[in-house]
Regions:
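Exported/periplasmic ABC-transporter solute-binding proteins
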Residues: 5-43, 47, 51-57, 66, ...
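Acidic, polar ligand-binding/catalytic clefts
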Residues: 60-86
Length: 257
């Protein structure tokens, strides 16, 4: 079938949050209608997504760990990096809130209380951008959560959805991006307990896998995707994605001067 042979597609290694939140189901048909290019997503934690791209198994990377992204660029694996959008992280926990942190805007103080009381906490433990952020906050709190591993601190080794399922089943606290939380249906008794701390800002970046490292990378098609995401149309499409009236991601691409 000639139509199949001629189909234009790229592989996008991306975070589970952009997939689990439903953002890609909203964006990708719009991009395809605009360009004729099918973007096929491999949804993994940020660490795994960057590893996939490093091997040349993706054309574009769309992730949220600024430090890991910069390292990827510095090592020559990524080019054309642009900041696309942001949302924020929140801490969720059982409505009974045994640690009494509900309504707090202090993520560090909340984590200290969780650790001091040894209240159950579920972590992704999967080298994702969300996991990396969670570990940064534990470090800022002066706590090594690994000391609680096997007792109050439990790593699922999986994506945000399964980790929230585990937290819901255990009545545990968890750290999540707001986008996945808003689209997550199986909340049980879980509610947001900590939000609004400026430290919880969560930036997403997109970049092309460097064709100088992997000549088979579809750089022209990949750049079209990046250009669309950062265009007025793409940015408006990101802003338009809502669940129950709540915007999940906020476009913030700024053209380099």
């Amino acid at each position: 079938m000639p139509a199949v042979a001629q189909e234009k597609f790229i592989v996008v290694a991306s975070t589970t949050s952009t997939e689990d939140s439903g953002l890609f189901k909203h964006l990708l048909p719009l991009f395809k209608a605009n360009s004729g290019i099918d973007a096929r997503v491999v949804a993994q934690g940020t660490g795994q997504a960057l590893a996939t791209a490093k091997k040349g198994d993706a054309d574009v990377v769309f992730v949220h760990d600024r430090v890991a992204e910069q390292k990827f660029v510095d090592e020559g694996f990524g080019i054309e990096r642009r900041e696309v959008m942001y949302n924020d992280f929140v801490v969720v926990g059982p409505i009974a809130d045994p640690v009494k942190i509900s309504g707090s805007k202090d993520v560090i103080g909340a984590l200290k209380k969780i650790a001091a009381s040894q209240s159950p906490f579920t972590s992704r433990g999967d080298r994702s951008g969300t996991h990396a952020a969670e570990l940064r906050y534990w470090k800022l709190a002066g706590i090594d959560p690994q000391t609680g591993k096997g007792s109050w601190y439990r790593e699922t080794g999986s994506g945000m959805g399964p980790t929230l399922n585990t937290a819901s089943a255990m009545g545990a606290y968890a750290f999540t991006d707001r986008g996945t939380w808003l689209s997550f249906k199986n909340r049980g008794d879980l509610v947001i307990v900590v939000e609004g701390d400026t430290k919880l800002f969560n930036q997403y970046g997109v970049m092309l896998v460097n064709p100088a490292k992997h000549p088979h990378v579809k750089s022209e098609l990949g750049v079209q995707f990046i250009d669309w995401l950062t265009s007025a149309e793409g940015q408006a499409a990101i802003a338009a994605y809502k669940i129950e009236g709540q915007q999940l991601f906020f476009p913030n691409y700024k053209k380099a001067s």
